[in-house]
Curated annotation (Swiss-Prot):
Species whose genome carries this gene: Hyalophora cecropia (Cecropia moth)
Tissue note: Hemolymph.
GO biological process: defense response to bacterium; innate immune response
Superkingdom per UniProt: Eukaryota
Function field: Antibacterial protein active against Gram-negative bacteria.
Protein name: Gloverin
Pfam families: Gloverin (PF10793)
Keyword Secreted tagged: yes
Sections of the chain in a coiled coil: none
Length: 130
């Protein structure tokens, strides 16, 4: 594989060319950090891929947003294969301390492929250490 990246302004252009069992592939994109301060850390990325194999080729493109702070995180990823349907994935989770022995953790996720029904997941835990 050949990988490269170059800093441009507040972001980075990246790319990879290589070969695997699916055939030849290339991936390129741009990643940028919007802020990293008391609001947390917020990053975004846009990318595209191309795979050439014995059965033909595929082209995908998408984007991703990630946010996190000391208590929580969230992510959103949207992608689409040319000729296909869009895919969406979103997740978030957090941990909040009430005192030194008590905390609440909770999170959830949503994922959908094309026009199908979305997969939804939620979880929560209340913990107290005696």
């Amino acid at each position: 594989d050949v990988t490269w990246d170059k800093n441009i302004g507040n972001g980075k252009v990246f790319g990879t060319l290589g070969q695997n069992d699916d055939g030849l592939f290339g991936k390129a994109g741009f990643k940028q950090q919007f802020f990293n301060d008391d609001r947390g850390k917020f990053e975004g990325q846009a990318y595209g891929t191309r795979v050439l194999g014995p059965a033909g080729g595929t082209t995908n493109f998408g984007g991703r947003l990630d946010w996190s702070d000391k208590n929580a995180n969230a992510a959103l990823d949207i992608s689409k294969q040319i000729g296909g349907r869009p895919n969406l994935s979103a997740s978030g989770a957090g941990v909040w301390d009430f005192d030194k022995n008590t905390r609440l953790s909770a999170g959830g996720s949503l994922s959908t492929m094309g026009r199908g029904k979305p997969d939804v997941g939620v979880h929560a835990q209340f913990q107290h250490d005696f």
